[in-house]
Amino acid sequence: MTKRIEEKIEGVIESLGYLLYDVSLVKENEHNILRVSLKNPNGAVSLDICQQVSEIISPLLDVCDFIQDAYILEVSSMGLERVLKTPKHFKLSLGEKVEVKLTNKESFQAVLKDANDWSADFELENHAIKSVEYKDLKKVKTLFEW
């Protein structure tokens, strides 16, 4: 269902100059919550941007009726520190510092240099490039340095 929602709202969000990072539908305290997270290629995602996107996609979602039950729409930035789960997440996080944990228990910190549909390239501290297929990644999380 979230894939259908993504397909419906992604073009609208891009027409406003922003990028759709993720869509998730969760249940918290008996409430269905539709979370839409954004990236602003020109800077931060402000509260005004979240409100603008929410006001535009809310009626669109109501008309499409993808979610049968009542839900709460939350629009937010993708966040400074987040787990990368899909090739799209990796592609939208290029150039960011990440902590990588592999399925073989190896871990390292690096800069995410490139990503495609099946693997990601990481620049290590010694400037060597390490290519890893997604199937070999256990967890990749962006790191924000203060």
UniProtKB/Swiss-Prot annotation:
GO biological process, one term: ribosomal small subunit assembly
Transmembrane segments: none
Keyword Cytoplasm: yes
PANTHER family: RIBOSOME MATURATION FACTOR RIMP
Family, per entry: Belongs to the RimP family.
Role this protein plays: Required for maturation of 30S ribosomal subunits.
Protein name, per record: Ribosome maturation factor RimP
Lineage, broadest ranks: Bacteria, Pseudomonadati, Campylobacterota, Epsilonproteobacteria, Campylobacterales
